[in-house]
Each structure stands twice: as structure tokens, then as C-alpha cells.
């Protein structure tokens, strides 16, 4: 950021945050103003704190130097080259893998873990890229924190 400011880069810069920056027990669906409103998930805390520091740095640079650094919080992304590992994938790739394996093995049902109560938001990776470009081209985007995604439950 410092280099971009010194070089007087006029285009926006986009910092991709993470949904882990929001409190563990934030009301669902999470709103932008939930940032810094409660305790973070302990297992993600160091990562979340680093992301929050970068978000704050974007805001500080914008106020002090008039830069156009944006912070976006992409929701749970899915798309090409996703991680389908049986033990480490996220919700959408895990569901795709389970459905594919069930069809391949001729299973008549698929077991989905959890209660179905937590709400998650999902966004296709190409749509996330389009949203980033759109936001960077806004003249009045300022230093707001931006989120995107569609809330849904997995049952």
C-alpha cells in the first residue's frame, strides 16, 4: 500500500478479507457493521486479526492520503479448481463430492452432516471477480467494507 501511494497509483486497490473477521456469534445473515462487534472464533483468531488490521489500514490510508483502497469480504466461494478433498473441503465442494460419489456408487441417499440450522452465504468465484472489478470502478466506493453473497441453509 505504501508503494502504491508513493507511486500515486490512481486506480483502486482491492483487499480481499474473509468472513472470519466477523464475530463468532454475529447475527445471521452477517451485516457489514458487525465487524469488531464481538469475540472472534478462537481457532481463526490470528488469521482474522491480521485481516482486520489490513482492513483498518485500507481505511487509514484512504483518510490520510486520499487513496482508493477497498476492503471486500467475499463470502464462501466455490468454482473451478476448488478443493474437493474429503477431509479439508468447504461446504459446496464437499456437497458436490458427496453427490457425485453417491451417483457413481448408485447410493439411494446421501448423508449430510450438521443440523441444517447454520446459515451460510455462497458465491461463484467468477461472480466474486466481477464484483471486485465493479467495486474498484465505482467513483464513490470510499473505504467501506463490502460483502456479497446469498444466504441459504444446507439441509
List where the protein language model places each region.
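Catalytic helix-loop patch of NAD(P)-dependent Rossmann-fold dehydrogenases
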Residues: 6-7, 11-12, 20-78, 82-87
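Heptad-repeat alpha-helical coiled-coil signaling segments
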Residues: 82-83, 118-120
Amino acid at each position: 500500500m505504501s508503494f502504491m501511494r508513493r507511486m500515486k497509483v490512481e486506480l483502486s486497490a482491492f483487499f480481499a478479507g474473509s468472513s472470519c473477521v466477523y464475530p463468532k456469534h454475529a447475527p445471521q445473515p452477517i451485516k457489514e457493521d458487525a465487524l469488531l462487534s464481538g469475540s472472534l472464533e478462537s481457532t481463526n483468531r490470528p488469521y482474522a486479526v491480521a485481516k482486520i488490521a489490513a482492513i483498518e489500514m485500507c481505511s487509514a490510508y484512504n483518510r490520510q492520503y486520499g487513496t482508493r483502497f477497498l476492503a471486500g469480504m467475499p463470502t464462501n466461494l466455490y468454482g473451478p479448481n476448488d478443493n474437493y478433498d474429503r477431509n479439508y473441503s468447504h461446504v459446496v465442494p464437499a456437497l458436490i463430492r458427496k453427490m457425485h460419489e453417491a451417483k457413481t456408487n448408485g447410493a439411494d441417499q446421501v448423508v449430510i452432516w450438521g443440523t441444517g440450522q447454520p446459515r451460510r452465504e455462497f458465491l461463484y468465484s467468477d461472480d466474486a471477480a466481477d464484483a471486485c472489478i465493479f467495486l474498484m470502478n465505482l467513483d464513490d466506493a470510499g473505504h467501506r467494507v463490502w460483502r456479497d453473497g446469498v444466504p441459504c441453509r444446507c439441509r
